[in-house]
C-alpha cells in the first residue's frame, strides 16, 4: 500500500520514448533552453514543467507534438571556470550537460531526446557561420569602427541592451566607452516591421510587447539647428515637442557628445573626466538623481534674440537621436526637475482651461499657446505644424523619425563562442571564409591565464592563408555574441545535419507554445524576431514571427534568512539555528539566488519526495505567470496528496468500466454529473493554460472519489471517475499516473491514451434555483425544471408570494431567466 516513488519513477522513466518526426508534427512546444551551468534549479523546474504539461495534454488530445530540448552552451562562465579550475571550456561544458541531462530526465519531462543539440557543437554553429556570410551578402551584416560599451572586468564589448544604468549586465562593472572595429547586424532595417507586428502577437503578454515597443523606441519629431556662439558650429537638437521651443531654457547634451571637444574650461573638462558613468540614466524609471555640468558653451535661439546655456547631463545619451535636446522645464517633468535643481527659468507656453501650479510639477497636457510669438492662440497640434513650417522655411529644421534601438553589435572578445568566419588580408582586405570551409572551429590548446582575447593571443590559430590571393592573412579573432546562437535554435530543431529544413520550418513554425522568463523580453525575444525576418530575406524559410503563444512564467521565491551580523543563511542553516534558540531574521520572499542563499536544492527535493511531488507543488496554487513562494508545508502537502491518491486507488478492488449508463440512477447520477463537470473544467483550464486551476479541480475530484468509495456508490461510476482522474493527472504528475494506469489494467502507455470527453448531457443542469422577490425583496428560493416556461413560473411565484403581496395589486412581473423573478405590487388606487 506504501507509495515507493523512487521505484515507480525509475521504472516509468525507463519505459518512455517521445520520439516525434518533425515532418509529421502538428504542435511545437518549446521551453527556453538552459545554459549548462552544472545543475538545474527551481526556476528550471517551473519553466520546463509548465511546458511539459502543455506537451502532454496536447498529445492526449490526439495532436502530434514536437517537444525538443537543447543547450545554450557558449558563454562566459565556461571561460571563468577554465581560469578558476584549469579546465578546458569544452570539457567543463560537456560535463555539465551530462549532469543536467540526467537531472532533467529525473523530472519526467517528455522530451524527444533524439533532437538534442548543443550550440557549442561545430555541427550547430557551422550553420550560423553560413547565416552570417549570407547576411553579409544581403547587406544585413557590416563592420565599422564604433564607440562601444567596454566591460573592463569581462574584457569584452557589450550590446546596448546589456548595459544597465551604466554597468555591465553580468559583471556589474562600470562600462567604458572605446572605439573598436566591430561587426553589426542591421536589425534597424526591420525596426518599423518589428514594431508594427507586435500587434499580431495577440497571445503574447502585454507587458512583453510594451517592453519591446519601448526598446524599439520610435520617436517622430524634428531636428533643429542651433548656432553655437563663438566657434562657428551648429548643434543639432532632436525634439518631439517643437511647439514648446519658445519655452526653452537650456540645451542638454550627452557626456559623449562631439561638441565637448570645444569646451576649453579646464575645470569643466576635469568635471567631465571625473563623472562616474554608473550615474548615467538609461531608463525613465531610474531613481538616479539628475545631474548636469554647465559646459560654458552657448547657443542662439533660432527664433528669439536670446542665448541658451549648454549643459552636459546624465539623462541624455549619445546613442539616441542626436544626443542633444532643448529643455522646456514648464512642459517636461525631467526638464522641470533639472531646472529647479540648477535655478533655471520656467516659462509656461501651453495654457489649459484651468490654471496649473508650476511650482510643483510640469504641465504636459494640451491647451492654447501663449508667450509664443506667432503661435499665440493656437492649439498644441496647430502650433506643432506652424513652427515646423516656419523653421523649415528658415532652413534650420527637418522632420525625422528616430529609433532608440540601434544595430546589434555582435563582436565579442571572448574564446568560448562561435568564431566569426572572416579573414583579413593586407592585399584583399576583408575576405569571407568560403562556405565549403565551414565550420571555422575553436582551438583547444588555449591559455586562459592571460588577460584579453584568448584567440587573439593564440600563437598559431589566427594565422592563415588568404583564400583569394594565397598570401599570409589573419582570422577574425572575435566571436559572436552568444545571443546569436539562441536567436535561431528553434529553427535548428526543425532541420537536419545539412541545416535548416525550409519545408519543415514553413510548416511547423512559429512555435505554438514558448515558455520562459520575462527577463528575456528584449534581448532574446527581439533578436529571435529579427532572425526570422533576416533568414526569410536570405531565403532560408518564409517565417515572420518565431513564437505565436508566449508564456512567461513567474519566479520561484523563498524567504531570506540572516544572522545577527546580517550575513545570509541557507534555509537549513536558519532552521538549525532557530531550533537551538539562536536569533535569525526572516526577510521577505525574494527570487531564489545563490548570493542571498535562499535556495532549495532540487536534487535533494527529488531524492526526498520524488519528481511528481516537486512538479505538483510547483504547479499548484499560483498561475504560471505569477511568482510562486516556496513553502516547506506546501511540498509536504503535495507529498501527502500523492500518498493518499495511491492508497485510495490501489485499495479499490471493484474497478470495472463495462457499464451501461442507462442503469445509473439517483445519487450515482449526481456523482457522475460532478465528475464530468470537473473533467470539463480541467479541459477548459488546460486549453487556456490555467494550470493551477486544473490542479485544484483534480484534487477536488480525488476527494469526490474518496467520498463515493465511502458511500458505496455504484462501482461502475467510481471506476469511471478513477479512470478520468488517472488520465487528467498524467500531464502534471506523470509517473504515479502511469503506474496507476498499469495497476487498473490499462493497455499501452498512459501518455498515449486519448483525453476523456465530458458527457454533454451531464453538463446540462436539469433543475435551476430561482429567487422569488416582491418589490425587490427576497421571498423564497424556488427549485424548478431547467426548461420551465415563463407563464408556469409566474403562476408558481404568485402562489408562493401571495401572503407577501397581500391586498396590493400586481402591476408587473419581471423574469431574469434562470436567476430571479420579481413581482411588482402596488397599493390599489
UniProtKB/Swiss-Prot annotation:
Q: Which GO terms describe its molecular function?
A: aminoacyl-tRNA deacylase activity; ATP binding; leucine-tRNA ligase activity
Q: Does the keyword Protein biosynthesis apply?
A: yes
Per the record, what are the reactions this protein catalyses? tRNA(Leu) + L-leucine + ATP = L-leucyl-tRNA(Leu) + AMP + diphosphate
Q: Which GO terms describe its biological process?
A: leucyl-tRNA aminoacylation
Q: Which PROSITE patterns match?
A: AA_TRNA_LIGASE_I
Binding-site residues, ATP: 594
Record-listed E.C. numbers: 6.1.1.4
Q: Where is this motif: 'HIGH' region?
A: 34-44
Q: Which Pfam families match?
A: Anticodon_1 (PF08264), tRNA-synt_1 (PF00133), tRNA-synt_1_2 (PF13603), tRNA-synt_1g (PF09334)
Q: Where is this motif: 'KMSKS' region?
A: 591-595
| InterPro entries in UniProt | aa-tRNA-synth_I_CS, aa-tRNA-synth_Ia, Leu-tRNA-ligase, Leu_tRNA-synth_edit, M/V/L/I-tRNA-synth_anticd-bd, Methionyl/Leucyl_tRNA_Synth, Rossmann-like_a/b/a_fold, tRNAsynth_Ia_anticodon-bd
Spell out the subcellular localization from the entry. Answer: Cytoplasm
**Which domain of life, per UniProt?**
Bacteria
Q: Name one GO cellular component term.
A: cytosol
Keywords annotated in UniProt: Aminoacyl-tRNA synthetase, ATP-binding, Cytoplasm, Ligase, Nucleotide-binding, Protein biosynthesis
Instruction: Please state which protein family the record places this protein in.
Output: Belongs to the class-I aminoacyl-tRNA synthetase family.
Tell me the NCBIfam families matching this sequence.
leuS_bact
**What name has this protein been given in UniProt?**
Leucine--tRNA ligase
